[in-house]
Amino acid sequence: MNQEMIVVLDFGSQYNQLITRRIREFGVYSELHPHTIRAEEIRALNAKGIIFSGGPNSVYDEQAFTCDPAIFELGLPILGICYGMQLMAHHLGGKVEKATHREYGKALIQVKNDSLLFHGLPDEQVVWMSHGDLVTAPPAGFAVDATSPSCPIAAMSDERRKWYGVQFHPEVRHSVYGNDLLKKFVFEVCGCRGDWTMENFIDEQVRRIREQVGGKKVLCALSGGVDSSVAAVLVHRAIGDQLTCIFVDHGLLRKGEAESVMKTFREQFQMNVIKVDAKDRFLAKLKGVTDPEQKRKIIGNEFIYVFDDEAAKLEGIEFLVQGTLYTDIIESGTATAQTIKSHHNVGGLPEDMKFELIEPLNTLFKDEVRALGTQLGIPDEIVWRQPFPGPGLGIRVLGEVTEEKLEIVRESDAILREEVKKAGLDREIWQYFTVLPDIRSVGVMGDARTYDYTVAIRAVTSIDGMTADWARIPWDVLERISTRIVNEVPHVNRVVYDITSKPPATIEWE
């Protein structure tokens, strides 16, 4: 497919993914690439324009990130943001100097030149600055578009070559007209049409999957989570009964989850789903184990063995579907990433399983995967399912995992989810669940002394799960949840609410 694209070069900014996402919100496809990408690779991508992201370096640092100089010979529009503008200025013969003081936060810029980026926008704008260096003399051919009290060149342009630079961050919401400016670059400067939609994405992926698979057989490990569900339905749309899904019920799922998965995929989507009831097998392996890391390893390894056993029964499988997301690719693959993560989308499958991978979601962000799921007709309760750990309730039962304890977590968690949804808070809270700490306490129920379990409620708000704050659930909602749990769930006489942020605590207790 010859789709239009804006390429974003990653120079290490904390906002680089945000630039890509903003452009996609305009209906234009965009990809984030390492700053080391060669000019000929960009040409092969059929890019309509290039954006240089910000970054923590100074252009004068010995280890400063730079780019292939041939990029400036491609004849493509370029927008440099923050460090990206400084790099352009430095490379093209302008002057970059250390600022007398680092500028961080909101600033007021004055527009001095009615370039295409600023045409029709206010002469005074609030923007978001975050820089230690600044451009003090523009390169030849560039006009100064805007200034601020502490930044003599807050924006510059060479309209003949369609090259622009802004010292501020238009991708951040604090830059009031930032979105307008980015739109002007994408549509008016680069000439994009804005026809990248989920419908187009589905059509293109269906074509690619059919081309890749031909008449061969495909396997998918279905967890019931958002990513594996959307990937499975998309692949099924492309190749139908050539796809077989394996759903391992390890007995550590939430209430009604296994039934919901089977109903949705086997009945609604008419997919080949093999359900493996492995509850006894997992509980036997977990007997007497209290260490959380050991529990994780046992559950992860056992999942592999069960999946491997089932896969071995199937003949002629050549492909494996994985729900890898674009964020996984970015975090694992860019040279500027601060943290490298390894991602195991199906629980870390054995290396000797010689399958060719199908990763239909590996160009999408999480919110786009949800939009795709909705477009494919997947029910809201799956599309909007919260993050759920691979080991499931095995790490929400602290200490040894038993059937009795799992039942307490299952029932209390179901009450929590029901009441949160009833209160209209289910889309506001990032994640909410109950935990069973390995403690009992004294209580009084029906005039009799009790010595029973405590249930903890954990609910957090977050953007990406990296940091989180405890959710301010209204007292009356908490009261209803607590009353129902102690009245409806056997062996519970106390409910507590975890009011710790991340950091210092993690979202999960184990």
Curated annotation (Swiss-Prot):
Catalytic activity: XMP + L-glutamine + ATP + H2O = GMP + L-glutamate + AMP + diphosphate + 2 H(+)
Main EC class the enzyme belongs to: ligase
Residues engaged in binding ATP: 223-229
Domain GMPS ATP-PPase: 196-385
Location of the active site: 82, 169, 171
Binding partners and assembly: Homodimer.
Protein name, UniProt field: GMP synthase [glutamine-hydrolyzing]
Organism: Geobacillus kaustophilus (strain HTA426)
Lineage: Bacteria, Bacillati, Bacillota, Bacilli, Bacillales
